[in-house]
Regions:
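PDZ/PDZ-like domain segments forming the peptide/carboxylate-binding groove
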Residues: 133-134, 138, 142-143, 197-225
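Conserved hydrophobic positions within beta-strands
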Residues: 17-19, 51-53, 110, 144, ...
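Chymotrypsin/trypsin-fold serine protease catalytic domain
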Residues: 90-125
Length: 225
């Protein structure tokens, strides 16, 4: 409060990304959210390039960047997307965990595929893939590769658990990309209601439901649904 005219100290953070067709870079939304300036560098190239967010999906934790200087893309082949990997198949993560100048490669196995909470905004459950390949801070936004194709984008781990990382699978990525084709990102649809299960006996008694009644109760309809 002694100097209210001063801005907060600028903090530096890093992540990973990869080039896709259309001269764009894909990364995580949480890597570039609230950034005052975005600087990207190519592998083994010390030159910094200014980038800006073209599209961002906070619900699916994905973002597309464009680079002002198109010379950034010279000699760079865009990566192609593959299909959803199978459980117990092998994948390789690429990225810069904890920063560093050299890219890191980590091999792992697909452990399971299920709906899970995306921690970036914490209130959406979308399809995700769990792997035992290490995914650490700095890996975020990096590609997960199988058979020379991108089968995911690394995006989160679980604090306190070893060999447990998660990546965003192709169905979510393709939905995000298709959504941006009209020039704006609308996001993943939601049902628009809050539901309550009817398993609790006290709750069932409150609603005066018979014992053989099953289903869920609509507690609330969200605005604009």
């Amino acid at each position: 409060w002694s100097a209210p005219w001063r801005f907060d100290a600028v903090q530096r953070a890093g992540g990973s990304g990869f080039v896709i067709k259309g001269k764009r870079i894909m990364t995580n939304a949480h890597v570039v959210s609230w950034a005052r300036q975005i600087i990207v560098r190519k592998y083994q190239d010390p030159k910094p390039y200014l980038a800006k967010v073209e599209y961002i999906g906070h619900d699916c934790d994905l973002a597309l960047l464009t680079v002002e200087d198109e010379s950034f893309f010279e000699g760079v082949e865009p990566l192609e997307f593959g299909e959803l990997p199978k459980v117990r198949s092998t994948v390789v993560t690429y990225g810069y965990p904890a920063g560093g100048e050299e890219i890191s490669y980590t091999r792992g196995v697909v452990s399971r595929i299920e709906l899970s909470v995306y921690s970036h905004i914490g209130n959406r459950r979308l399809l995700s893939v769990q792997t035992d390949a290490a995914i650490n801070p700095g890996n975020s936004g990096g590609p997960v590769i199988q058979d020379d194709r991108v089968v995911g984008v690394a995006f989160q781990g679980i604090s306190g658990l070893e060999n447990t990382g998660f990546f965003i699978p192709p169905p979510v990525i393709q939905h995000f990309l298709k959504d941006t084709q009209d020039g704006k990102y609308d996001g993943f649809p939601r049902v628009g209601v809050n539901l309550a299960t009817l398993q609790n006996p006290a709750y069932r008694a409150l609603l005066k439901l018979p014992d053989n009644n099953q289903g869920v109760r609509v507690d609330r309809i969200l605005p604009k649904s």
